[in-house]
A protein has these predicted regions:
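Active-site donor-binding segments of glycosyltransferases and PAPS-dependent sulfotransferases
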Residues: 26-97
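Acidic donor-binding loop of glycosyltransferase active sites
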Residues: 260-272, 285
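Membrane-proximal helix-turn-helix segments that form the acceptor-binding/catalytic region
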Residues: 126-155, 163-164
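A charged, aromatic-enriched C-terminal amphipathic alpha-helix characteristic of glycosyltransferases
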Residues: 314, 325-367
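Nucleotide-activated donor-binding/catalytic signature segment of Leloir-type glycosyltransferases, i.e.
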Residues: 234-254
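Conserved acidic donor-binding segment of nucleotide-sugar-dependent glycosyltransferases
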Residues: 301-302, 306-312, 320-327
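Conserved donor-binding/catalytic core segment of Leloir-type glycosyltransferases
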Residues: 187-225
Length: 371
């Protein structure tokens, strides 16, 4: 069986790329198709596969300014000839689901309907497309996105929150399979001795609202480490007072050490799932999170963290005060993390694909050869 995996772009190792790795473990001979591929920015495991980039790869400056090329993404994602493949799996938070599968069974693992065009154009770092140029093309991109969703045979959502967004924007049903967390790597320390600092971690983009976390810690004077890279890095450094270390990008080993030693993780995003929160919990680190989106599926108030109601510095400060009044036993913080394990993800994805393949074979009256 020939398998193609479509991924929006490859320019860093974030949550979507961790999902891609796990899917590739299930389909080790798959070919990856992507809008553009910045070599050396993803894991050696991903790099070891055959990777086909679109014609966007040849545009000068694409790695730095790709968000400004959003109106070109639909044409690029539709440009491949995939007739040789039996199964197409798209890993999509933008346009990957719009690939033309040309008769193959197409399953989309949807990280989110495209934020750029549906509900967060003012929150995401889109460069020049924030302004009139983007507003002019937005209705056309919304129409294309709905047409692209109709090409998908079956949707998988990464959370119940995204499942509802798929229903709202595309009128499609989806099965929920939460993203994979490496619970063999993200483990608690031998001695659970927390240090006197808080952690905020992830991609430093505006919709994740690191700014309100920094503002809260500017006001309450507690120590904060901000770990991650992205377009907001320098802005956050300018905002931060001396008690805040905006560290930038850290290795996975350093991130794990921070999870293992931080007093708590502060998570202010209205996130589709939020893998960072579960990684922290797996290391025994409780989470102080905005009570919306995927956090409602991973943080149980008073058990493995604290939820706050508004994305405002004052709400963060009040949540930290509540947090500090409570003890956080290690096993209580970790009690659900194994349900998000990499093994659980792969088992559920494999079962979903096999069931849909069997249904497809029955409809066609054909029997596909196993890989």
């Amino acid at each position: 069986m020939k398998v193609a995996i479509i991924h929006d772009w490859l320019n860093g190792m974030r949550g979507g790329e961790k999902v891609l790795e796990a899917i590739l473990e299930l389909f080790p001979h798959a070919t990856i198709y992507t809008l553009f591929h910045e070599r050396g920015k993803v894991s050696p495991f991903i790099e070891s596969h055959r990777i086909v980039a679109s014609w966007l790869q040849s545009i000068p400056g694409v790695y730095r300014h790709y968000r400004n090329l959003l109106p070109l993404f639909p044409a690029a994602i539709e440009s491949w000839d995939l007739r040789e493949f039996d199964l197409v799996i798209s890993s999509s938070h933008a346009v990957a689901k719009g690939v033309r599968a040309q008769g193959a069974l197409h399953i989309c693992y949807c990280h989110t309907p495209m934020r750029y065009v549906w509900d967060a154009e003012d929150d995401y770092a889109l460069g020049a497309l924030r302004h009139a140029a983007f507003r002019a093309v937005r209705p056309r991109l919304q129409r294309w996105d709905c047409e692209a969703a109709a090409r998908v045979d079956h949707f998988i959502a990464n959370s119940r929150f995204v499942q509802e967004r798929i229903r709202e924007y595309y009128g499609r049903s989806a099965e929920v399979v939460h993203p994979p967390i490496d619970t063999h790597y993200f483990t608690p320390p031998a001695l659970n001795q927390r240090e006197d600092f808080y952690l905020a971690a992830g991609a430093l983009v505006s919709y994740k609202r690191f700014d309100i976390v920094v503002q809260a810690f500017n006001a309450n004077h507690r120590r904060l480490v901000v770990a991650g890279d992205g377009p907001d890095l320098q802005r956050l450094r300018r905002m931060a007072t001396r008690n805040i270390d905006v560290r930038g990008w850290v290795t996975s080993e350093e991130l794990r050490r921070l999870y293992r030693t931080a007093r708590g993780l502060v998570f202010a995003a209205r996130e589709d799932f939020g893998m960072v929160a579960v990684e922290a919990q797996a290391c025994g680190c409780p989470v102080i999170a905005y009570g919306a989106g995927g956090s409602l599926e991973t943080v149980q108030d008073g058990v493995n963290g604290i939820l706050f109601a508004e994305q405002h510095p004052d709400d963060v400060i009040r949540a930290i005060h509540r947090f500090e009044l409570q003890a956080w036993p290690l096993e209580q913080v970790r009690f659900r993390t194994e349900t998000f394990s990499r093994e659980s993800f792969k088992t559920r994805i494999k079962k979903f694909v096999e069931e849909r393949q069997n249904q497809n074979q029955e409809r066609r009256g054909l029997r596909l050869q196993p890989a």
